Amino acid sequence: MRAAIAVADPLANSASRLLLSTNRTIHVIGAGLAGLSAAVRLASVGQHVVVHELARHAGGRCRSYFEPALGLTIDNGNHLLLSGNHAAIGFLKTIGAEDKLAGPRESVFTFADLATGERWQLRLNNGRLPWWIFSKARRIPRTRARDYLALLGLLIAGRDHSVGEVIDCTGALYERLCRPILLAALNAEPPKASAQLAGAVVRESLARGGAACRPLIATDGLGAAFIDPALAYLRGRGAVVRFDHQLRRLDLAEDRVGALHFGEDVIELAHDDVVILAVPAWIAPTLVPELVAPKQFQAILNAHFAITPPPGLPSMLGVINGTTEWLFSFADRLSVTISAADRFNEAAREPLAHTIWSEVAALTGLDGKIPRWHIIKERRATFAALPGENARRPGSRTRWRNLILAGDWTATGLPSTIESSIRSGNRAAEIVTRTQFW
């Protein structure tokens, strides 16, 4: 007989109780951050978790690997976190990897203009009252305090509105702050992007003050920060992680999933077993045919250069009026990120690498001779953060009572980010622990 017991949730702030079956199995399909965060949260309260991953490694679009062309271990994409990303920080605390992020003690963002050679810093004060906008030394050059009031429109924007319909996408504030920040966060050119998602970015960053807006980077790589410690945590709590294990079909009965088909391997589900489907947005509808999910995606391009950064270079530099958009400085390399990069999908890599390096050399004062380089084009890095695509994001629950969705493409209220992925996994785990499935 399977028993249900009430257990306090160490990860939750509420006083509510959890319904936990002592011997049911939670099958998590996908070992990206959404799946790993769900698995970690469930394992932390004693649930039996089995993670099934198609690839031979975990992490999905958030992982590290050794690149022979550079002779270095790199991330498949550069990711910036903020100190106010409570789900991501909480996840790292749980798996014992909070010390893997590094950043300034204050909220400081450095920018450079390739066209004029100008440089400036945005310096937020710690409190929620944004007195920094009244300081010329802290706000964006050529802007006035009242210019920032325009951002309030994003906080109340409806789901159908684009950024260009809500704020003026011209002028110093837009070109020197809004466009770089929103382009990076949304991975879409802001004028056509979802104003609602842009509002969420502003609400969770600038509007919360500098204490929540310190930039943080995984200096030793995403794998060392998020993936390897999560796998160790899961295995230490009895979870099973199966790689090279592709889910090919779900047996979808009237109100529940009855079985999981992994080729010749078929797992029949017990009456209280649960499935968390944490696969990419383009895969989920092939497994759940009636599922509505985003259909358009945007690329991100990262260029890595095997060279020691010069002294004094900030760990992250925002760039305007160039191909380069963000320059990240690591101990053994310089890395450039370009968002909404579909225009480069078919571009020849070598000329593009030389173009990017010429900008990096100008920004850093390094020799113009290009070092060893490697370009990664992630063609479906994020769902397209457009109003119509945002409206297609499903909630976590499905009409099958033991099938739950997770992923940054679900309706988290945030764009496609690490924080969104982890929140979706946490939400899926919360549904599991607070719902009776039998």
What are the residue ranges of the model-derived segments?
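Helical element adjacent to the flavin cofactor pocket in flavoenzyme catalytic cores
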Residues: 201-263
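Conserved flavin/dinucleotide-binding core of flavoenzymes
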Residues: 2-13, 123-125, 327-438
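Glycine-rich active-site loop/strand segments that organize a redox cofactor
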Residues: 62-84, 151-152
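Mobile amphipathic helical/loop "lid" adjacent to a hydrophobic cofactor/ligand pocket
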Residues: 84-203, 212
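Glycine-rich FAD pyrophosphate-binding loop
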Residues: 43-68
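N-terminal Rossmann-like FAD-binding beta1-loop-alpha1 element of flavoenzymes
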Residues: 24-51
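Extreme N-terminal leader/targeting segments of oxidoreductases
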Residues: 1-26, 44-45
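Mid-domain catalytic core of redox enzymes
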Residues: 2-9, 245-365
